[in-house]
Design a protein with these regions (language model features):
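Conserved glycine-rich Rossmann-like NAD(P)H-binding loop of the short-chain dehydrogenase/reductase
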Residues: 32-60
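The beta1-alpha1 cofactor-binding region of Rossmann-like NAD(H)/NADP(H)-dependent oxidoreductases
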Residues: 55-56, 76-89
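C-terminal substrate-recognition "lid" of short-chain dehydrogenase/reductases
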Residues: 4, 96-97, 240-267
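Conserved glycine-rich cofactor-binding loop
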Residues: 16-17
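Catalytic loop of short-chain dehydrogenase/reductase
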Residues: 108-112, 118-133, 137, 157-189, ...
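A glycine/serine/threonine-rich, flexible loop-to-helix segment
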Residues: 45-50, 116-119, 182, 199, ...
Length: 267
């Protein structure tokens, strides 16, 4: 039986674990063939669930995609390299056909601050803002996101396609982000790129939206984080990656065809 994304191919970045993996699997459930990217960034000397997940390759995700009868490839790439987006699209097109769905989930997260001595709401400290923290964050979140979208639309037009979906992920709404200032700046830039894409690609049949998940349990949640969420009126609960993936799957389906140019906050 045809499903909403039957015959379409998707590219999901940062998909060896967590939200990215859940999104890739959800798109496969909806019928898409899926390419996933990953970069093993965990500390191999640590055995906690979060580091184990961050140290994984993409084989677990591709196996889950294939269990739904869909084709899958996993590509280990460092998105801080500006040559990677074009190469990714070449590889995905060769293996799965033109990319109709782009989900940019990868992040170059580093915790930096102008007041690094002050612990944040859950007791974590930061490093001082420097060129390394700025480059790590902006190169992966903002620049890679912008180049992936540019590659997407250039190929979309060359194939004379009339249907496309772009979803990027943020943490915040483009305002201040104390304690993680370069993270906030990278996500603010990504929001701007995505909303501009929504305006400029609408006539090509492409929707573009930003999803702002709640605190999500991708393996990093501690008792301190749970206590913070429970006592904060701005947060309703700690989400599972699959809950976020359901929303992104809906945006990527035909049901999301008139939803574009939004920052969609989930709680």
């Amino acid at each position: 039986m045809p499903t909403p994304l039957t015959g379409r191919s998707a590219l999901v970045t940062g998909a060896n674990h967590g939200i990215g993996a859940a999104v890739a699997i959800r798109l496969a459930e909806l019928g898409a063939d899926v390419a996933v990217t990953y970069l093993r960034t965990g500390d191999p000397s640590r055995s906690d669930d979060y580091n184990v997940a961050r140290s994984a390759d993409g084989s677990g995700t591709t196996a889950a995609i294939e269990s739904h009868g869909r084709r899958a490839i996993a590509l280990e790439e460092d998105l801080s390299d500006p040559a990677v987006p074009a190469r990714l699209f070449d590889q995905v097109e060769s293996a799965l056909g033109p990319v109709a769905v782009l989900v940019h989930n990868a992040s170059g997260w580093r915790k930096d601050s102008y007041a690094p001595q002050r612990p944040d709401a859950v007791g974590r400290t930061s490093a001082m803002v420097d060129r390394h923290s700025i480059d790590s964050q902006l190169h992966v979140d903002a620049r890679a996101g912008a180049l992936l979208m540019a590659e997407f639309i250039a190929r979309h037009r060359s194939h004379k396609s009339t249907w496309g979906r772009i979803v990027t992920l943020t943490s915040g709404e483009g305002r201040q982000f104390p304690g993680e200032v370069s993270y906030g700046a990278g996500k603010a830039a990504l929001i701007s790129y995505t909303l501009s894409a929504a305006a400029e690609m609408a006539s090509d049949g492409v929707t573009a939206n930003v999803v702002y998940p709640p605190v999500t349990d991708t393996g990093w949640i501690t008792d301190e984080v749970r206590d913070f969420v429970a006592g904060d009126v701005d947060h309703h609960h700690i989400a599972e990656p699959e809950e976020v993936a359901e929303v992104i799957g809906w945006l990527c389906s035909s049901a999301g065809r008139i939803v574009t140019g939004n920052v969609i906050r989930l709680r």
